[in-house]
Swiss-Prot record:
Domain of life: Bacteria
Native organism: Dictyoglomus turgidum (strain DSM 6724 / Z-1310)
Family: Belongs to the glutaminase PdxT/SNO family.
Function: Catalyzes the hydrolysis of glutamine to glutamate and ammonia as part of the biosynthesis of pyridoxal 5'-phosphate. The resulting ammonia molecule is channeled to the active site of PdxS.
Residues forming the catalytic site: 78, 171, 173
UniProt-recorded name of the protein: Pyridoxal 5'-phosphate synthase subunit PdxT
InterPro entries cross-referenced by the UniProt entry: Class_I_gatase-like, PdxT/SNO, PdxT/SNO_CS
Gene behind the chain: pdxT
Length: 190
C-alpha cells in the first residue's frame, strides 16, 4: 500500500513519521501525476487559504477533486478538513474540493495561543481515550445526512466520515497514538 501526503505545506513530516511507524510507503504529493500511484491521501493541517492557492498553482485542485469523487480515500486534518468541506460558514467565497457534506467555521477554537489538547472517547478506536490536539481548529457546524460522526467535543463533531472521506478538526499526527492512522489505512485497503 502506498499513501500520499499532500506536501505543499503544513504538518507533512509529522504524518509521514506516523505512516513510517506503521511501515507504510509514503508519496509526497506535489504534482498531479503523484495522485496516480497512491491508494489514499492525507491532507494535513496548515493554513487553508494558502492550501487553495498552492493547489491551483500546481494544477492539483481539479485532478484531486476528480480522484476523490471517484473514490480515492482521503483523511483531512484541521486545514485539510476545511479543504474537503462543502461549505465554509465564515468564508463562503473560499473555494473547496466539496467532497465532504459538512459546513465548517474556520479558526472556531480561537487563535494560536488558545490552542489546547484534551482526551476524547472515540468508540471506533476502542476503549482508550484519544488525545485530540486543537490548533486554531475549525469547527464542524453542520453535517449532511450521510455523514457519520465518530467523535464530538462540546456537542460539536470533531471526527466525521462520509464514504471514502475522513475529516478531523484536530491533529492526530501530533500525538504518539497511531490508531486514527491505522483506521485510515484500514479504510484504504477496503
Amino acid at each position: 500500500m502506498r499513501i500520499g501526503i499532500l506536501a505543499i505545506q503544513g504538518s507533512v513530516v509529522e504524518h509521514e513519521k506516523m505512516l513510517k511507524r506503521l511501515e507504510v510507503e509514503t508519496v509526497l504529493v506535489k504534482k498531479p501525476e503523484h495522485l496516480d500511484i497512491i491508494n489514499g491521501i492525507i491532507l494535513p493541517g496548515g493554513e487553508s487559504t494558502t492550501f487553495f492557492t498552492l493547489l491551483e498553482n500546481r494544477l492539483l485542485f481539479d485532478v484531486l477533486r476528480e480522484k476523490l469523487a471517484n473514490g480515492l480515500p482521503a483523511m483531512g486534518t484541521c486545514a485539510g478538513l476545511i479543504l474537503l468541506a462543502n461549505r465554509i460558514e465564515n468564508h463562503p467565497d473560499q473555494k473547496t474540493l466539496k467532497v465532504l457534506d459538512i459546513t465548517v467555521s474556520r479558526n472556531a477554537y480561537g487563535r494560536q495561543r488558545e490552542s489546547f489538547s484534551t482526551y476524547i472517547k472515540i468508540p471506533i478506536l476502542g476503549e482508550k481515550e484519544f488525545e485530540c490536539v486543537f490548533i486554531r481548529a475549525p469547527q464542524i457546524v453542520e453535517i449532511g445526512k450521510n455523514v457519520k460522526v465518530h467523535a464530538t467535543f462540546e456537542n460539536k463533531p470533531i471526527f466525521v466520515e462520509e464514504g471514502n472521506i475522513l475529516g478531523l478538526t484536530f491533529h492526530p499526527e501530533l500525538t504518539d497514538d497511531l490508531r486514527i492512522h491505522e483506521y485510515f489505512l484500514k479504510r484504504c485497503s477496503e
